Amino acid sequence: MSRYRGPRFKKIRRLGALPGLTSKRPKAGSDLRNQSRSVKKSQYRIRLEEKQKLRFHYGLTERQLLKYVRIAGKAKGSTGQVLLQLLEMRLDNILFRLGMALTIPQARQLVNHGHILVNGRIVDIPSYRCKPRDIITVKDEQNSRTLVQNLIDSSAPEELPNHLTLHTFQYEGLVNQIIDRKCVGLKINELLVVEYYSRQT
């Protein structure tokens, strides 16, 4: 299944706010309609919608998300929390959380086009897994820095999660540590996502 490229507002109207996909928010009226429908939802549909919420927020294909679930299942600790850590530590998501991009798809473009360096080397793989003490910088070229500066100026000021530090004037971000569960930027029940996949096998 390919990455979603359809109308974004259609997705947030059904699934709720997906800040990684779009900065738009569902209207209050649409929330009420969804709540009235939710009474009739089956447990399967509830799990499916949580899975879809995760997939669309992080901009993943079904195959990519399944791969992350399998990796998380083999790791020590809670599968759901490890899954969120894996997704949050992707380079495209780190750029989004630093405020260097307005959405994760936008951050992915920055990476794909060679504007981003990790520890002094260009990384053009959006799924690159960042680690504590990684230094993320914008390429030292005018078009790269102007592009990112415009995105920083356009983004609404938000408090950075404690696992990240941003030095705006140096166009530099620092990964301090693995993200805490409480700092994940999406309202999600990750256990339902794990349950969804466990029932598919």
From Swiss-Prot:
Its main location: plastid. GO terms for molecular function: rRNA binding; structural constituent of ribosome. One of the primary rRNA binding proteins, it binds directly to 16S rRNA where it nucleates assembly of the body of the 30S subunit. One of its GO terms (biological process) is ribosomal small subunit biogenesis. Keywords: Chloroplast, Plastid, Ribonucleoprotein, Ribosomal protein, RNA-binding, rRNA-binding. The gene is rps4. This is Small ribosomal subunit protein uS4c. The lineage of its organism: Eukaryota, Viridiplantae, Streptophyta, Embryophyta, Tracheophyta. Belongs to the universal ribosomal protein uS4 family. Residues 89-152 form the S4 RNA-binding domain. It holds the Pfam family S4. One of its GO terms (cellular component) is small ribosomal subunit. InterPro entries: Ribosomal_uS4, Ribosomal_uS4_bac-type, Ribosomal_uS4_CS, Ribosomal_uS4_N, S4_RNA-bd, S4_RNA-bd_sf. NCBIfam families: PRK05327.1, rpsD_bact. It is found in: Plastid, Chloroplast. Part of the 30S ribosomal subunit. Contacts protein S5. The interaction surface between S4 and S5 is involved in control of translational fidelity.
